[in-house]
A protein has these predicted regions:
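Residue-level signal for transmembrane alpha-helical positions in Major Facilitator Superfamily
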Residues: 23-24, 149, 225, 267, ...
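Short coil/loop linkers at secondary-structure junctions
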Residues: 38-39, 167, 239-240, 263, ...
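Residue-level signal for pocket-adjacent positions within structured domains
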Residues: 64-66, 111, 196, 201, ...
Length: 388
């Protein structure tokens, strides 16, 4: 088989990962920036800086470790900012970014976060990943109601390609879905224009109130709801990399770019699973190339940061969510198998899975964190009971 034939799924996995990441949460970023009082031009500059920051970090880490290390912004953190920044000046918002990213960098330097991550059993990490991805898998079929032609054709294409040419199943699904959506008039091209926007430096301001009321919660949510699931995802996918160096790189870059609107650069979870799955490459040692491709697409998204919102508006949501769900089915099934394969850990794993899948938010912290907490409590109690 020609080497180029191996590159198609790899490049596509990187593209789908970036597409899903932006489609699922770019609007939240705009809401958070608007809440801080940023202008449309400044918001576009934030998207540019975020794309470049995530692209550089993904390329550097994946190349250095020869592992699929995908970075992302903190979607839970962005959601918290969108609801917390009203009444806070733009300068104070930048101060919050610098404060939180400095704390994240400190966690990497001290090794505190790495020590916490070593306490998570592999079965619970896999269960957490399956719980996080479950909703994406359900979306692949939920859109059959209301968008039967589009989603039905994509599912049919995926099934046929999976049976005949599994390496190209997502390629075929993307193309078939794109053709059907275009023919049905669901692709609204007049909403998309290419534009280049330079990020704008914003001088920070630090106030005790904003740092304590927004900065600290944002730091905790980012670490618990984004970085922790990100490392658990890598561990569940067979890439147990040391946490501290990755936190230092991502936290350091985020701190450097904070004055330009980069509120966080974290280890990705959901989108990383696309690049870490067998669909990206049959050889686990070659899947880092999918992350390299994703890094390239991140840079493109950054260069054309002002066009991202228009692109997301041009594509039908049903097409994006069905594509993402089908791309993640293999990861979901593999994670469930790893989570439930050990009978002694099965109860703790199912508690982790169901808590995570529930989507519950407590104290502003998402369900992935609470899934690991409750599952960890069950794991400790049941282990002690068995040894008694």
């Amino acid at each position: 088989m020609r080497p180029s034939s191996h590159l198609v799924p790899v490049v596509l996995a990187g593209f789908v990962a970036v597409l899903v990441g932006y489609a699922s949460s770019a609007a939240i970023i705009w809401q958070a920036a608007a809440a801080a009082g940023a202008s449309a031009h400044q918001i576009a500059g934030w998207m540019t800086a975020l794309g470049i920051g995530m692209g550089v970090s993904t390329l550097v880490l994946s190349w250095w470790y020869k592992a699929p290390v995908l970075t992302a912004w903190s979607t839970p953190g962005a959601a918290l900012l969108a609801t917390s920044l009203h009444g806070v000046t733009l300068a104070e918002t930048i101060g919050v970014f610098i404060f939180a990213n400095a704390l994240i960098l400190l966690c990497g330097i001290t090794g505190l976060f790495a020590r916490l991550m070593t306490l998570i059993p592999h079965s619970l990490a896999a269960a957490m990943l399956a719980g996080v991805l479950l909703q994406f898998g359900l979306h692949a079929f939920a859109h059959l109601e209301g968008h039967f032609l589009l989603c039905g054709s994509m599912i049919a294409a995926w099934l046929i390609a999976k049976a005949l040419a599994p390496r190209y199943a997502i390629v075929v699904t993307l193309l078939v879905g794109g053709i059907v959506a275009w023919a049905a008039g669901d692709v609204v091209t007049d909403k998309f224009t290419l534009s280049l926007v330079m990020p704008e430096f914003i001088a920070p301001a630090f106030t005790f109130t904003s740092l304590v009321s927004i900065g600290l919660p944002f730091f905790l949510v980012t670490m618990a709801s984004q970085n922790a699931p990100g490392f658990a995802t890598m561990k569940a996918s067979g890439y147990p990399l040391a946490a501290s160096p990755l936190i230092i790189v991502t936290g350091g870059l985020a701190l450097l770019f904070s004055p330009f609107g980069v509120f966080s650069i974290c280890i990705a979870a959901i989108t990383a699973a696309i690049c870490q799955s067998p669909d990206a490459h049959a050889d686990a040692d070659k899947r880092w190339l999918a992350a390299i491709a994703a890094g390239g697409f991140y840079l493109l998204a950054g260069i054309f940061g002002g066009s991202i919102t228009g692109l997301m508006a041009a594509l039908p949501l049903s097409w994006i969510q069905t594509l993402a769900g089908l791309a993640l089915l293999g990861t979901i099934s593999g994670s469930l198998y790893q989570a439930l394969s050990h009978e002694a850990e099965r109860d703790a794993a199912i508690v982790t899975f169901l808590t995570t899948a529930s989507g519950v938010t407590i104290l502003g912290i998402g369900s992935a964190f609470w899934g690991l907490v409750l599952g960890g409590v069950c794991y400790a109690l049941f282990s002690r009971a068995r040894s008694a």
